């Protein structure tokens, strides 16, 4: 593997510093940025956290921030780390966000307009710290034709043995 240092792809702006998130390839141009655009979702953090996006038309070398950022806001202090993926069964983009001590799910037909769908976490798992950096993936069940969804959730601080921790939940997703 050979790594080459590149300039900062998405710099802080008036909305704040840039926290973690995820990228998708919009192969069908649902957002209208261009077929095959790489669309980055990230948390803009200042006195509050909001969700923003930027897109690249040159394979991720440079990104242009969406001119209508932020795309999602909240009254919650901890509102971060968007994980976005295409859900073929619903024909929509799905966003999972860490919000306080739960995960919130949103859907969108075009990566720009998001609708709240549901939340998960109350009464589930560890709650000693803030939930963050979610991931939601579908995995096959060994030896069967079944598939299960796994929601991965990091806790910081508040791990059962001190420091940070990761927990996961196995179930269905619709």
PLM-predicted stretches and their roles:
Residues 1-82, 86-133, 138-174:
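Beta-rich carbohydrate-recognition and catalytic domains
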């Amino acid at each position: 593997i050979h790594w080459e240092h590149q300039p900062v792809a998405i710099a802080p702006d008036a909305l704040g510093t840039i926290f973690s998130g995820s990228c998708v390839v919009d192969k069908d141009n649902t957002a209208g940025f261009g077929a095959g655009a790489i669309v980055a979702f990230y948390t803009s953090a200042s006195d509050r956290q909001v969700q923003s996006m930027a897109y690249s038309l040159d394979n991720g070398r440079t990104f242009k921030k969406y001119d209508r950022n932020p795309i999602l806001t909240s009254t919650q202090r901890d509102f971060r780390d968007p994980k976005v993926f295409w859900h073929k069964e619903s024909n929509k983009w799905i966003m999972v966000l860490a919000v306080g001590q739960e995960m919130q799910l949103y859907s969108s037909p075009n990566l720009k307009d998001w609708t709240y769908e549901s939340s998960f976490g109350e009464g589930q798992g560890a709650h000693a710290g803030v939930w963050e950096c979610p991931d939601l993936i579908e995995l096959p069940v060994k030896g069967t034709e079944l598939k299960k969804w796994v929601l991965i959730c990091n806790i910081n601080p508040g791990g059962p043995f001190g420091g940070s921790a990761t927990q996961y939940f196995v179930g269905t997703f619709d």
